[in-house]
From Swiss-Prot:
InterPro entries: Bifun_inhib/LTP/seed_sf, Bifunc_inhib/LTP/seed_store, nsLTP2. Disulfide bonds join 4-38, 12-26, 27-62, 36-69. Potential phospholipid transfer protein. GO terms for molecular function: lipid binding. The lineage of its organism: Eukaryota, Viridiplantae, Streptophyta, Embryophyta, Tracheophyta. Belongs to the plant LTP family. B11E subfamily. It comes from Zea mays (Maize). Transmembrane segments: none annotated. This is Probable non-specific lipid-transfer protein 2. One of its GO terms (biological process) is lipid transport. Keywords: Disulfide bond, Lipid transport, Lipid-binding, Transport.
Amino acid sequence: ANPCNPAQLTPCAGPALFGGAVPPACCAQLRAQQGCLCGYARSPNYGSYIRSPNAARLFAICNLPMPRCR
């Protein structure tokens, strides 16, 4: 089964774009989809979320490493 499902990251969209509280569901999905994030970063639909200034804050709050995309 492919764990990459950007729709599951919906709980992260608000905090990624506007800041504010990060729900536990967001951290759970970021953790589950860590291997997918670089693909999203390259995508025209989702790249702005991953590259947004608030994204680093999400990873910090969730205690996850920032994805290092090549």
